């Protein structure tokens, strides 16, 4: 049995989200939440909220035991990129790419 949670279009670059996601892959849920709580990265609170959502899904929808849950899959994929322009010298402009991510977590029981 597995429980899943997905956050889409979150405003953080996938490369930066991937650093946080790699820290908790394969860990037990309570250990992963402790790691995320003290990780000083912008993606950490987003991933922490996502893991808590997956735990709630496991408990309420599937009736799984919280103490036996671990993160079997977690990944951050690229979402759509918002393109903006920043004015530069001499009437020019450069493109600023505001990247978004889709982060997905799958929990299983041991």
Swiss-Prot record:
Keyword field: Ribonucleoprotein, Ribosomal protein, RNA-binding, rRNA-binding
Gene: rplV
Gene Ontology MF terms in the entry: rRNA binding; structural constituent of ribosome
Quaternary structure and interacting proteins, as annotated: Part of the 50S ribosomal subunit.
Stated role: This protein binds specifically to 23S rRNA; its binding is stimulated by other ribosomal proteins, e.g. L4, L17, and L20. It is important during the early stages of 50S assembly. It makes multiple contacts with different domains of the 23S rRNA in the assembled 50S subunit and ribosome. The globular domain of the protein is located near the polypeptide exit tunnel on the outside of the subunit, while an extended beta-hairpin is found that lines the wall of the exit tunnel in the center of the 70S ribosome.
GO biological process: translation
Keyword Ribonucleoprotein included in the entry's annotation: yes
InterPro entries linked: Ribosomal_uL22 (IPR001063), Ribosomal_uL22_bac/chlpt-type (IPR005727), Ribosomal_uL22_bac/org-type (IPR047867), Ribosomal_uL22_CS (IPR018260), Ribosomal_uL22_sf (IPR036394)
Organism listed in the record: Alkaliphilus oremlandii (strain OhILAs) (Clostridium oremlandii (strain OhILAs))
Protein's name according to its UniProt entry: Large ribosomal subunit protein uL22
UniProt family annotation: Belongs to the universal ribosomal protein uL22 family.
HAMAP family: Ribosomal_uL22_B
Pfam families found in the cross-reference section: Ribosomal_L22
GO CC annotation terms, alphabetical: cytosolic large ribosomal subunit
